Amino acid sequence: MTLRQNKVAIRLGNFVFHGDDFGVIIKRDETIVGDVWTFMSLSSGDITMLREHQLTPYTRRKNGTVPAENMSDKQRRAIGLIEQNLQINWNGRTMEDVSTFIGLFKEASLMVTRKQRQRSYDQYAGLDGFD
């Protein structure tokens, strides 16, 4: 049996299908047998570890859905910051995907920003005008 190779690379943060189940990739582990992806189902919330050949990239939006290109500048900036802070990749196609992505990753992105700010302030801790 020949394994089907995905033409589109799967990356952390991507929406993907596992069979008929739609979800998001939340972790990648490099193992001696290849990459193992942690998949979170958006319908049930179940988390499953899968090999890449068990996943199908999300490449097209369903007919009748509003395209992600209609997102506001504020949403576009939020997605860009989330990608930058968490080192993940956006591949959504619809406005529902925009909402889901921001809802899933916004808090984690804000925590990264807070930690970075705190570290920059910590270097001044204990200093006074005479140090």
Label each region the model flagged.
Residues 1-12:
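Mixed-charge, Lys/Arg-rich low-complexity intrinsically disordered regions
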Residues 21-30:
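Short beta-strand-centered aromatic/proline hotspots
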Residues 34-38:
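Short aromatic-glycine-enriched beta-strand elements
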Residues 41-66:
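Intrinsically disordered, low-complexity, charged/polar segments
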Residues 62-131:
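A charge-rich, low-complexity, intrinsically flexible signal that marks solvent-exposed coils, linkers
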